[in-house]
Amino acid sequence: LARVRALIIVAVLIITAAVVVIMAIGKDTQTNFQVERCAPGLVPAKTKMPDEVEVTIHVYNGTKKKALAADVAFDFENRGFTTEQPTEEPPEAFADRSFEDEVAVIVFGPEAVGAGYLVSAYFLVDEATLEFDIEREGAVVDVIIGEQFQQLATRTEVNQSIAAIGHPDPPEGTCAID
C-alpha cells in the first residue's frame, strides 16, 4: 500500500512538472530575443542555412550562351528551390560588369545570408562569388551565371560544401538573429 501511494505521488509530481514546463514555453515572451540583443546600428541578419524548399532564387545569365538562365533555374527547381522567372541578361546594377572569369555571382541581403551560402554550396566552395548587400530587402537570392559555369554540384559535393561552410558568420554591419 505504501508503494502504491509513493508511485501515485511521483506520477502526480511528474504530471505537474510537465504542465508547468508546457505553460512556461507557451507563455514565453522572448520571441524577439535575438533581434533585441543586436547592438544599436547593426542590421539583423538571418544566417541559419534553410532547406532548399525555403529558398527563392532569381537566375540571371551573365554570359552570351542562349537560354542558360532558364536551364540553370530548371536545375535549381529539380533540387527543391523555388525560382522566379529567369532573366537572360544580368541585372541592371551589374550591366557594366564582366562575368567572363566568374562561375557565378550570388547576391543577397540580410534576410537571406544563410540562403545565399546554401546556394553557393551548389557551385562548390570558393567557386561562386558572394556579394552581400546590407541595404537589400527581401529574401530572394540573385544568381548571376558567369562564363566559367559548367554545371551545378552533385548532392555529395553540396553536402561537402555545406559541411565546409558550417554556420555562416554574419556579414559586417549585421548581427545573427538565428
Feature annotation, model-predicted:
Residues 1, 8-13, 71-73, 77-150:
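BRCT (BRCA1 C-terminal) domain core and associated BRCT-interaction motifs
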Residues 1-4, 41-44, 170-178:
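Short, charged N-terminal helix-start/capping segments
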Residues 7-23:
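Hydrophobic membrane-insertion alpha-helices, especially the h-region
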Residues 22-32:
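Hydrophobic single-pass membrane-insertion segments
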Residues 31-93:
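Extracytoplasmic low-complexity, Pro/Thr/Ser/Ala/Gly-rich segments
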Residues 147-178:
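Extracellularly exposed regions in secreted/surface proteins, prominently low-complexity, repeat-rich
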